[in-house]
Amino acid sequence: MPSIDLNCDLGESFGAYTIGMDAEILPYVTSANIACGFHAGDPSVMQKSVLLCKKYGVQVGAHPGLPDLQGFGRRRMAIPPAEAEADVMYQIGALKAFCDAAGVPLHHVKPHGALYNMTARDPVLAAAICRAVQAAPPDAVLLALSGSEMVKAANAIGLPVASEVFADRGYQADGSLVPRGAPGAMIEDEDTAIARVLQMAAQGTVQADDGSTVTLQADSVCVHGDGPKALSFVQKISAALLAAGTAVAAF
């Protein structure tokens, strides 16, 4: 039976602020991307998130972002590649400390927000982030947008990479995501989103915002856990994949 991973972003609370439905979502995903303190999260939340993943048998990933707590890491920055590389190494190391304490491996690394989108298009920045991930624990996998510069950069240095697709995001004809705030950026209708996930999993294609067909490699599907219908949405995606003959399993 073919399989696909379901991943979600986790541990985005910090201080007095609670974001997401972490404990409720985890039983239905197979890997999680934990914020490492730069765009969200704090040491206590990181520790709690790792322990929650261990409880539910979910693979732990680092989710490093730009140093932008106020903007939730979604604002682009003119950051030098060497500085971004150091920032990502720092964040990976912080999460690995909690993984080591909990006795679980650091399975993967997925950049967050603006850093994710910038590295998807910028080959120099992508190469810098791939070097940071390669310096991480042995066998840590890069999780990156399908067809992006990150995937190319990882392949160029022999870094293991899994290609990611999105359940609730619109695509442009070049395979990039429709920018947040633009028309078609978010797929609001659950049935439409689920149908797109099934198509990506079975056929490796998705319809772009201009009506063209984009070819994708779908190793993992990102599902967001911070919306009011997040839990039911994840449950429905998991059930639909199983009904279509696709197992849900970590990459």
Predicted regions and their residues:
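C-terminal domain-boundary segment and adjacent tail
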Residues: 140, 232-251
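Active-site rim beta-loop-alpha module in soluble metabolic enzymes
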Residues: 147-205
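Flexible, glycine/charged-enriched surface loops at secondary-structure junctions
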Residues: 99-107, 204-215, 245-251
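Conserved, mostly hydrophobic/aromatic
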Residues: 9, 63, 109, 223
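Acidic (Asp/Glu)-rich catalytic clusters
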Residues: 23-27, 48-61, 100-101
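Charged helix-capping and loop-helix junction motifs
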Residues: 122-128
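Glycine-rich tight-turn/loop motif centered on a GG-T
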Residues: 18, 22, 32-39, 70-85, ...
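Glycine/small-residue-rich loop that forms an oxyanion/phosphate-binding "nest" at active or ligand-binding sites
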Residues: 68-108
